[in-house]
Every structure is written in structure tokens, then in C-alpha cells.
Amino acid sequence: MATINMTPGDLELGRDRGRIGKPIEIPLLENFGFDSQLGPFYLGFWNAVAYITGGIFTFIWLMVMFAQVNYNPVAFAKYFVVLQIDPPSSRYGLSFPPLNEGGWWLIATFFLTVSIFAWYMHIYTRAKALGIKPYLAYGFTGAIALYLVIYIIRPVWMGDWSEAPAHGIKALLDWTNNVSVRYGNFYYNPFHMLSIFFLLGSTLLLAMHAGTIWALEKYAAHEEWNEIQAPGTGTERAQLFWRWCMGFNANAYSIHLWAFWFAWLCGITGALGVFFSMPDFVNNWFQWGIEAGINYPQGPTPPVSLP
């Protein structure tokens, strides 16, 4: 039987320390794959800042779009996906424009950024308080890097807020497509290639890990710490299954390392791919692909003869 060495005092956090409410049992949650316990909820300073600033961003975003349809709830629901808050036009550069010409976008982006960093501090400080390593916060930096490059770093580098996407569902998709078209097709962007590789790879790793543990539930393979050291258990069967099918085994620890790095690198390489898509670095990824030898040069159009 495995023993867990716990540093004395790590979990002696007191009765309150920012917790809100008492735990309650909701058995219905178990039908959706969750634990039945709900709460207690920890607020704390950073979490409060994250929720307040995130709420302000959401309020500005929704109300500005609501005003665009003259506060018509039917039209708001109908066109919600295509409504957006546009950034300032290129003539304003990095200056602060009137509210209805991009000012609301700047204000909303400020509160969104504060909310994201406050949430990072919340999960970091909570991990430290529990005596665990803040790897969840470290993983979150991959998403933060991509966000900062798209909304702040790249537009500031180019001296133009209009290079950032609008706040909206369809608007973000349109921005991604437009940047790809302007800079010669993202398919030839090596960082985009890596980002998609890590995106699909992390999805595959998660599916492989989840499928293996789910398949061995009847052997209690989800109790990994005790399972991994005993013969004939679900975990041993999982290791044998991987060796039989793939020739090697990723254990309950290493599979999470693989998944972490794949997911983190998805955001980091995506951020690099977006950042280098500008005239100062790469103006045409298709031409870059030709020069890098991963794409055929464009030849002259063959003559067309009509009968």
C-alpha cells in the first residue's frame, strides 16, 4: 500500500480563509461525470478582482452590442453571433478615440486583460496556499501569451489598434481569416503548423488517456496511486494494453506531462505565428514557404488554346 508524505501544516488553512458557503451534495452531478459535492467556494482578493473586471467587460460588450440593434431584444438574440465591438480605425493609431469609434473596445479590452491576469494570480496563489506546484497557472500562460499577442503586443508593435480583432463571436473568426489572407495563407506559417500539431496532438493524448481509464473503470483504474503498484489491477492492464498496441507505455504520470506540454505549446506556437505575421517579419507566408523549400515556386500560367 502506498503512503503519502504530507508536509505538516500544508492543509491547516483554518475554517474560513475566504471560503464562502458550506459544501452541499447534489447527486445529480454524478450523472454528468462530476463529483456530487458543490462548494465551498473560495473568493479571495484576486478572484474578486477577476469576477468584477470580467463582469464589467461582459456588461460593456453586451450593452454596446445591444445598443447597435436599438435595444431590441429579438434583434439582439437573432444577430448576437454577428454583433461586435470594433477596435479603433487605423487613423487613430494607438491614441484613444471617441467611445463610439473604438473607445468602448479599448475600455472593454482593458478590463478583460485585468480579469485574465487576476484569474492567473488566483489559481497561482491558491496552489501555493495548498502546498501544490502551480502547474495549472503555468499552463494558463500559454493561453495568456496568445491573447496578449493578438490583442495587445502585435497591435502595439504595428502602431495600430485596428490590427486587433473586434470583440464578437464571428468577428474573431473573420479576423483570423483576414490575417491569413493578408499574409499569404497561414497554412505555410511554420508556427501555425506546430500550433495545429500540438492542438490535435493534445486532443489525441487526452482521448487516449481518457479512453484507457474509462475502459478500465471496472478494475478501479481511476485510483491510480494505489493501482500502479499492484499486479493484476486496472493500471497494470492499461500498461500492458499500451505496450501490446503501441510498443511503449505512457504511465499515469507521464501521460499528463505529454498532455500539458502539447496543450501549452499550442498557445505559445500560435502566439509566435500571429506575431511574425506582419510586414516587419513575414509579409507573405506562401512566398516564405517557397524560399524555405516547402512549397513549389509558382510557374507561368500555361497557354490555353481553344478549338
UniProtKB/Swiss-Prot annotation:
Q: What is this protein called?
A: Reaction center protein M chain
**Location(s), subcellular:** Cell membrane
Instruction: Describe the subunit structure.
Output: Reaction center is composed of four bacteriochlorophylls, two bacteriopheophytins, two ubiquinones, one iron, and two highly hydrophobic polypeptide chains (designated L and M).
UniProt organism field: Chloroflexus aurantiacus (strain ATCC 29366 / DSM 635 / J-10-fl)
One Gene Ontology cellular component annotation? plasma membrane
Function text: The reaction center is a membrane-bound complex that mediates the initial photochemical event in the electron transfer process of photosynthesis.
InterPro entries, alphabetically?
Photo_II_D1/D2_sf, Photo_RC_L/M, Photo_RC_L/M_CS, Photo_RC_M
Q: Which residues bind (7R,8Z)-bacteriochlorophyll b?
A: H192
Choose any GO biological process term that the UniProt entry carries and state it: photosynthetic electron transport in photosystem II
Tell me the residues on which Blocked amino end (Ala) occurs: A2
Residue ranges the record marks as coiled coil: none
| Presence of the UniProt keyword RNA-binding in the record | no
Q: Mind listing the GO molecular function terms for this protein?
A: bacteriochlorophyll binding; electron transporter, transferring electrons within the cyclic electron transport pathway of photosynthesis activity; metal ion binding
Family as reported in the entry's similarity comment: Belongs to the reaction center PufL/M/PsbA/D family.
- Name the residues that span the membrane: 45-69, 103-123, 133-153, 196-216, 257-277
* NCBIfam families according to UniProt: pufM (TIGR01115)
According to Swiss-Prot or TrEMBL, what is its membrane topology?
Multi-pass membrane protein
Q: For binding Fe cation, which residues are annotated in this chain's numbering? A: H209, E236, H256
What keywords are assigned to this protein? Bacteriochlorophyll, Cell membrane, Chlorophyll, Chromophore, Electron transport, Iron, Magnesium, Membrane, Metal-binding, Photosynthesis, Reaction center, Transmembrane, Transmembrane helix, Transport
